[in-house]
């Protein structure tokens, strides 16, 4: 097994390929990509034996923007016999001898064609899990040091990749997709983007400390209030900045102040440090990056989650430019900070970025 399979949003295979090639090279790992447009996954094949496993251990999954999941795989199994699909899969795993495995996930790429296999995947999981347990596998806790999850990626009927991922360096979600329910009282479906961002960027154990009823937030381009809703739900008082109207349900909470102003010109009230800045405005990504940079450098906010709408072409390059700009500006000013970006499931032609400022040198 010396390949990586990376799941992604259909249509973002080239961005995923460019990113894994760059990140692998930074670790001294080289290889080549096999991809099919709109397939929802790519294969990165390493030149050196053992390098795929090294990437799965050392390349921090949270650093990858476009990948939803990262697993080590071997050659594709093709034309699995209908009467016995399990034996060829078990045979591939026997070479690995995954005694430190915790569970099995039988998945597909996130495309309409592949998802037709999901019913089969669910039914197939039970007998496959039983067979793997008979081998003495799937016995470890997913929290055990060095434990792995076993993953099967079915790309079409009878054809799959057999692989694994390290539990401490992968998405915990089936197919790399968090299943979020749209809250009936939320003003717009965009609320799921911020909910997924919080789930992705903020450790669950820290969430109640990072969002409290003593905190203040600003939502630039807030109308009708999908993102404001997520902050208010967590107790934060929000200055909702938008010329448009906010949902009446948010006004009724008493936890927002509507500021009918231009998001690019708004400044926080004097002597008021904003704990959270959020922004989902439709604007050129570099213009948004400069706006966010201004807020952070001026000390107007401590932490921010914002979206960057991507151009039709050179999307990965645009992301690199925007993130490099923000990192350089913050470093120039002597800030200690953490920056993460992710192409979330609920994002479309955009990525979501999180920056937390921890202090100054």
Swiss-Prot record:
Gene that produces this protein: rlmM
UniProt key word Methyltransferase: yes
Listed Pfam families: FtsJ, RlmM_FDX, RLMM_N
Name of the protein: Ribosomal RNA large subunit methyltransferase M
Keyword Cell membrane carried by entry: no
Keywords: Cytoplasm, Methyltransferase, rRNA processing, S-adenosyl-L-methionine, Transferase
Lineage: Bacteria, Pseudomonadati, Pseudomonadota, Gammaproteobacteria, Pasteurellales
Annotated GO MF terms: S-adenosylmethionine-dependent methyltransferase activity
InterPro entries: RlmM_FDX, RlmM_THUMP-like, RNA_MeTrfase_FtsJ_dom, rRNA_MeTrfase_M, SAM-dependent_MTases_sf
């Amino acid at each position: 097994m010396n390949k990586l399979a990376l799941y992604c949003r259909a249509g973002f295979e080239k961005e995923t390929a460019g990113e894994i090639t760059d990140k692998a090279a930074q670790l001294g790992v080289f290889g080549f990509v096999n991809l099919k447009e709109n397939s929802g996954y790519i294969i990165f094949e390493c030149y050196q034996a053992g390098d795929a496993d090294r990437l799965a251990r050392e390349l921090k999954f949270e650093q990858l923007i476009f990948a939803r999941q990262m697993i080590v795989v071997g050659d594709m199994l093709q034309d699995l016999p209908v009467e016995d699909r399990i034996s060829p899969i078990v045979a591939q795993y026997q070479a690995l001898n995954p005694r430190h495995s915790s569970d099995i996930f039988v998945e597909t790429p996130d495309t309409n064609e592949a998802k037709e296999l999901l019913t089969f995947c669910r039914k197939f999981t039970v007998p496959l899990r039983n067979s793997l347990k008979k081998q003495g596998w799937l016995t470890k806790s997913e929290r055990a040091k060095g434990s792995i999850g076993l993953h099967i990626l079915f790309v079409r009927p009878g054809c799959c990749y057999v692989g694994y991922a390290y539990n401490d360096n992968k998405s915990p979600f089936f197919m790399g997709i968090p299943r979020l329910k749209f809250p009936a009282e939320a003003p717009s479906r965009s609320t799921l983007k911020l909910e997924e961002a919080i789930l992705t960027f903020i450790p669950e154990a820290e969430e109640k400390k990072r969002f409290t009823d003593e905190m203040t937030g600003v939502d630039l381009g807030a109308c009708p209030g999908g993102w404001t809703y997520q902050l208010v739900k967590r107790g934060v008082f929000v200055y909702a900045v938008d010329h448009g109207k906010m949902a009446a349900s948010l006004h009724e909470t008493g936890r927002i102040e509507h500021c009918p102003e231009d998001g690019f010109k708004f400044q926080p009230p004097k002597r008021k440090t904003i704990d959270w800045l959020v922004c989902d405005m439709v604007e050129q990504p570099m213009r948004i990056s400069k706006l966010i940079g201004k807020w952070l450098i001026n000390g107007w906010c401590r932490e921010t989650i914002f979206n960057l709408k991507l151009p039709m072409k050179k999307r990965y390059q645009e992301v690199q430019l925007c993130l490099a700009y923000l990192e350089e500006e913050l470093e120039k000013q002597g800030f200690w900070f953490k920056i993460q970006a992710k192409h979330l499931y609920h994002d479309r032609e955009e990525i979501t970025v999180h920056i937390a400022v921890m202090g100054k040198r």
